[in-house]
Amino acid sequence: MKAHDRASVLPHTGAMRTTDIHSYQPRQGHGLLHDPFNAIVGPRPIGWISTCNAQGAANLAPYSFFNAFNYVPPIVGFASIGLKDTVRNVQATGEFVWNLATRDLAEAMNTTCAAVPPEVDEFVLAGLTPRASTLVRPPRVAESRVTFECRCTQVQQLHGADGTAVDTWLVLGEVVAVHIDKALLRDGIYDTANAGHILRAGGPADYFTVGPEQLFKMHRPR
């Protein structure tokens, strides 16, 4: 009996039967009502990124592809599908700010998704307050409870496995200054469970929140 056949007839092992698995090759289509990729790789933290152009005009936009990539030094990054104003601004100034999106700021964050001309100030559009950063030129969102001031380390156009360039741009930056609402610090520890983070899910209008009820602890084996 082959290994894959054996796995399919031994349900007590916890392995799924091969007949219960939907498999596909993305370049040939997923065969479902909606591409599940974003829903599977998620929920994801939101890259709510503020930048400014060389003349100092501010821009604010959310990105659903965002995460941390290194601890020391701290490096975060986001991907932009298309060479948008945010990426152009980072290329021009070498700086950006990440602003934490929380449940109370969800509507304002969503407003900054709007496709508007470069001269439109998303801070004004969303009724948000720009606050001067300490080390970089782009402003922070004053209403955001956590902000990272970042200096760009690289901007990279992505490529597929066949070497073909993709119209998506990865921006990485070192976090050079951090600002945290002191109410979120409990005995010197950041209280993620009660900070109200919102996360991007798979559907076009789907989001998740993080709360204490989702918290569980599991230590690494020694």
Question: What spans do the regions from the language model cover?
Answer:
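Basic, polyanion-binding surface patches
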Residues: 4-222
